[in-house]
């Protein structure tokens, strides 16, 4: 059986998740990228609880972007997730790229979150 691109992402994600673990002091910033949208969550893995979330499906974001599948949308989500995290008192996170390569939309989200004040 030939591996598809999706299979490769899933394999990489399993490898990454063995090493990346979020605590209450330093939660995990998880990124999921689909063909049409991008999603980001700040997760405390010890409590198995999502602390903060943002995606291109939200009304406030959707009205300001043309498409949820480009770097501009990722930059906005990165800024938004950082802003919401800082409001909740979360300054340090562990970045989980979700099996995707650190390139393009994932990289744009990460850099925007760093510029907005998150430390990782």
UniProtKB/Swiss-Prot annotation:
Belongs to the universal ribosomal protein uL18 family. It comes from Trichodesmium erythraeum (strain IMS101). Part of the 50S ribosomal subunit; part of the 5S rRNA/L5/L18/L25 subcomplex. Contacts the 5S and 23S rRNAs. GO terms for biological process: translation. Keywords: Ribonucleoprotein, Ribosomal protein, RNA-binding, rRNA-binding. NCBIfam families: L18_bact. SUPFAM superfamilies: Translational machinery components. This is one of the proteins that bind and probably mediate the attachment of the 5S RNA into the large ribosomal subunit, where it forms part of the central protuberance. One of its GO terms (molecular function) is structural constituent of ribosome. One of its GO terms (cellular component) is cytosolic large ribosomal subunit. The keyword RNA-binding applies. The lineage of its organism: Bacteria, Bacillati, Cyanobacteriota, Cyanophyceae, Oscillatoriophycideae. This is Large ribosomal subunit protein uL18.
